[in-house]
Amino acid sequence: MKTEVKICGLKTAEAVERAVALGASHVGFIFFPKSPRNIEPDDAGRLAARARGRAKIVAVTVDADNDGLDEIVSALDPDVLQLHGSETPERVLSIKALYGLPVMKALAVREASDLERIDPYLGIVDRFLLDAKPPAGSDLPGGNGISFDWRLLDALDGSVDYMLSGGLNAGNIADALALTGARAIDTSSGVESAPGIKDLTLMEAFFEAVRRAEA
């Protein structure tokens, strides 16, 4: 499969094993108490051991302090840190210096002007995760099952390395790939039967849809 696929918000051994068997390039574990996909660092570490060496391990955090990051990095030994809060470029630099890990910075997109927020992070983050801006009043910065207008990415400089996220599922991934040319994609709620509950059948359908889109 040419497209990198990240399955995020994993909480069970069965889901981790299936994601990797289907061809996931990345598996994500979410450390954010307000999320239905939240997982304790030690539990995530045990699950990550099932994928290590076959998929990249991603720790997803939201404005975590150094003590929180220390615990997560120690337990999970991630390949990538995904920062999904309001972390500034300065904070990203500090985190990279502390842990020596690649950083993927999530940015919320609803309109063209939101893409201007990429510029201050260029040369600092290793990759962006472009997600849909959450609805008003939502406690979750991601995993809300909504998409943004993918045509906005037409204006994006082709040198910007990003992973596309936001409401991706088996029914829309072909259009998303065709419109954006994205080489890396992320899904969480799109392969769930309920918030935080991964559905293996939906996961299989998602990978099959990606393969058909690539054909």
Curated annotation (Swiss-Prot):
Substrates-to-products reaction catalysed: N-(5-phospho-beta-D-ribosyl)anthranilate = 1-(2-carboxyphenylamino)-1-deoxy-D-ribulose 5-phosphate
EC top class named in words: isomerase
EC number: 5.3.1.24
Residues passing through the membrane, by range: none
GO annotation (BP), single: L-tryptophan biosynthetic process
Molecular-function annotations in GO: phosphoribosylanthranilate isomerase activity
SUPFAM superfamilies (UniProt xref): Ribulose-phoshate binding barrel
InterPro entries cross-referenced by the UniProt entry: Aldolase_TIM, PRAI_dom, RibuloseP-bd_barrel, TrpF_fam
Keywords linked to the UniProt accession: Amino-acid biosynthesis, Aromatic amino acid biosynthesis, Isomerase, Tryptophan biosynthesis
Keyword Amino-acid biosynthesis appears in the UniProt entry: yes
Annotated Pfam families: PRAI (PF00697)
Pathway membership: Amino-acid biosynthesis; L-tryptophan biosynthesis; L-tryptophan from chorismate: step 3/5
Highest taxon, organism lineage: Bacteria
Family statement: Belongs to the TrpF family.
PANTHER family the record matches: N-(5'-PHOSPHORIBOSYL)ANTHRANILATE ISOMERASE
Name of the protein described by the UniProt record: N-(5'-phosphoribosyl)anthranilate isomerase
Native source species: Rhizobium meliloti (strain 1021) (Ensifer meliloti)
The organism's taxonomic lineage, starting at the top: Bacteria, Pseudomonadati, Pseudomonadota, Alphaproteobacteria, Hyphomicrobiales
This protein's encoding gene: trpF
